[in-house]
């Protein structure tokens, strides 16, 4: 996700336009109920928008529009869909500074990160999936006798997509780009904490020339909008990114209604293994960036760090120095590299975990406290003396907190790393290619990074093992998430009987 280096620092432009309505059938409209909800800047706790609140009636209208649009959009030429998505990518890139400023305001992340990571990778996702649009190939399996068999892939239909608050624009791009490229239509619900960039993206989709109803965007709450999408009998597929607990609920709702297709990208408690031969300066930088990037609100954050006992003290010293050097503050202030947590609820949750860790007997190496009286800021935090049955070691905190533990033997530490309900990501810092290749195979995670972390590329699949999810985003594998195979059997009418 994070590029090797961020572009030069620059001031975030002032946000001058915020779309506050729902997008249904090509028009921006208020909610049927007339309800709105407040969107708060997590850096200063001030209200920045009052956004229309979608509920069941709005979901019904959006699904109806998506179903109607699907009947024609599914039959469109794949090269036309490719060019349409390339146009959308160009529009997003042209407006990248505006979108980054809006994301920073909405989510709290540093403007430079929003610009060079969230927006830049979103553009790449749209361009990559545009390239897939005309490369979805069927097959002609061998058949016995005078028969012909063709297997083709076709779009699933109306796709519900529920987007998280940690990467609002980027996660929308992860899901929206393959869905539209394959010829599906979409009802998308952004997180209630961070709806602004998704709705602005909807304006760009309309500007690019997508037909009415192909994309519908419904800001709202999970209980009254997200659950209605997941339960809707005319939604064919649901894609969700968020916590494992809510993922269970989404899957249950899909099963209890029309057995709609489900793809889930869920939680993680990712382990980073620092080997005895690792470059400790590099390893400490990898760990620092990946623990505190996006204020730790990343499902792949290296929140469990296992360090060989021979280099443990030096590594912890380097990690502490790096953590204490982080510049924490509002995302739109130049030079800050860690913003606030996204909401009051998340702020209280993270501080609660830190308090629980202290009570359980873990040692705070650095950090552990909130910062200031305004905004949802928490110090970068490191725990040592952690036992693996502690909540801070087992549960996903989703904040700038990590646990650093010793190990003696690689086989032993891989077992410890795998002892989790999660399997989203893992990492190894080592100078040995043999070690990297061997143990990356043994780690039960959908992604393993070696001497790096959160290094995403649209051509590589992303998803989790175990309770970290079902299915994959990105890569060629994403085609399977938004198409269905159809077998067609032909009997020859020119069979000559003896």
From Swiss-Prot:
Transit peptide residue numbers: 1-9
Entry keyword Cell wall biogenesis/degradation: no
Function, in words: Could have an RNA-binding activity in addition of its catalytic role.
Main localization, broad class: mitochondrion
Binding annotation for NAD(+): 242-247
Cross-referenced Pfam families: Aldedh (PF00171)
Protein name: Aldehyde dehydrogenase, mitochondrial
Uppermost EC category: oxidoreductase
Membership in a protein family: Belongs to the aldehyde dehydrogenase family.
MF terms (GO), sorted A to Z: aldehyde dehydrogenase (NAD+) activity; RNA binding
Site residues by UniProt (Transition state stabilizer): 166
GO biological process entries: ethanol catabolic process
Compartmental location: Mitochondrion
């Amino acid at each position: 996700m994070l590029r090797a280096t961020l572009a030069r620092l620059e001031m975030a432009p002032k946000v001058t336009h915020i779309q506050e309505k729902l997008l249904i059938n090509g028009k921006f409209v208020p909610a049927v109920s007339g309800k709105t909800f407040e969107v708060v800047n997590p850096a200063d706790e001030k209200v920045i928008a009052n956004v229309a609140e979608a509920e069941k009636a709005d979901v019904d209208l959006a699904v109806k529009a998506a179903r109607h649009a699907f009947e024609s959009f599914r039959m469109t030429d794949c090269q036309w869909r490719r060019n349409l998505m390339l146009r959308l990518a160009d529009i997003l890139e042209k407006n990248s500074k505006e979108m980054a400023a809006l994301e920073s305001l909405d989510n709290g992340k540093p403007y430079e990160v929003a610009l060079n990571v969230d927006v830049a990778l979103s553009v790449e996702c749209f361009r990559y999936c545009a390239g897939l649009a005309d490369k979805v190939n069927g097959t002609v399996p061998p058949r016995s006798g005078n028969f012909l068999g063709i297997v083709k892939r076709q779009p699933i239909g109306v796709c519900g997509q529920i987007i998280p608050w940690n990467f609002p624009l980027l996660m929308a791009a992860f899901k929206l780009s393959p869905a539209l490229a394959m010829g599906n239509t979409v009802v998308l619900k952004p997180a209630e904490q961070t709806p602004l960039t998704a709705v602005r993206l909807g304006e760009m989709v309309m500007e690019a020339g997508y037909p009415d109803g192909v994309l519908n965007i419904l800001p709202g709450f999970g209980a009254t909008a997200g659950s209605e999408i997941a339960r809707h009998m005319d939604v064919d597929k649901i894609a969700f990114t968020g916590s494992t607990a809510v993922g269970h609920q989404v899957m249950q709702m899909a099963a209890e209604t029309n057995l709609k297709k489900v793809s889930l990208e869920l939680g993680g408690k990712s382990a980073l293994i620092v080997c005895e031969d690792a470059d400790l300066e590099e390893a400490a930088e990898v760990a620092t960036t990946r623990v505190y990037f996006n204020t730790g609100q990343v499902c792949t954050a290296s929140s469990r760090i296992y360090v060989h006992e021979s280099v443990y003290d030096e590594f912890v010293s380097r990690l502490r120095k790096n953590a204490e050097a982080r510049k924490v503050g509002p995302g739109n202030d130049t030079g800050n590299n860690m913003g606030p947590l996204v909401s009051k609820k998340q702020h209280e949750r993270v501080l609660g975990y830190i308090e629980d860790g202290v009570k359980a007997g873990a040692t705070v190496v650095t950090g552990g406290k909130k910062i200031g009286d305004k905004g949802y800021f928490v110090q970068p935090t490191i725990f040592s003396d952690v036992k693996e049955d502690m909540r801070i070691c087992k549960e996903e905190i989703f904040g700038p907190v990590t646990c650093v533990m010793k190990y003696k033997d690689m086989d032993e530490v891989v077992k410890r790393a795998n002892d989790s309900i999660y399997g989203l990501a893992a990492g190894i810092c080592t100078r040995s290619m043999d070690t990297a290749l061997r143990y990356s195979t043994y780690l039960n995670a959908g992604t393993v990074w070696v001497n790096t972390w959160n290094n995403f590329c649209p051509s590589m699949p992303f998803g989790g093992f175990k309770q970290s999810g079902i299915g994959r985003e990105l890569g060629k594998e994403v085609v399977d998430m938004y198409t269905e195979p159809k077998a067609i059997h032909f009997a020859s009418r020119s069979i000559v009987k003896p």
